[in-house]
Amino acid sequence: MGPIIVHFGFCGSEKAYRKTMKRMGVSDPMPFVPPGAGASVRTFEKPGSNMTILMCYDAESESGSTRNQIDSLIAHEAAHVAQYCLEYMREKPDAHETFAYIVQYVFGFVTNELWGD
């Protein structure tokens, strides 16, 4: 088996999510973020194509949250991204180091998008 490609994206608003869904050709997407959740992870896989994973973050609903609370929420969702990646790659269930690297990458990517530092 060769390389396994997984596309990852981040949508920090419902507007960005709708734009991404349109660009991906998804005509009936799942809701942006479930009510009260603050963030969610969406997966998309077309036959014969690679998996796309989107982390969605509702900045409006989290406007009263501290940076630490937001970062914790992003870390939580990054763990879900890693779970989906490992499942898609058919990685061994005990692939702890691979899981940790994925979480680290996703968390760093998203917090850089949010905070720019």
Report residues per predicted region.
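Non-catalytic architectural context of zinc metalloproteases
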Residues: 1-5, 42-44, 71
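Active-site scaffold of zinc-dependent metalloenzymes
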Residues: 25-68, 81
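Acidic-and-aromatic substrate-binding clefts and catalytic sites of carbohydrate-active enzymes
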Residues: 63-64, 90, 100
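Short, conserved micro-motifs enriched in small and acidic residues
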Residues: 68-69, 73, 94-98
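Active-site recognition of the HExxH zinc-binding catalytic motif
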Residues: 72-84
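Short helix/strand-bridging catalytic loops that position acidic/His residues to coordinate divalent metals
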Residues: 85-92
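Post-HExxH zinc-binding segment in Zn-dependent metallohydrolases
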Residues: 93-117
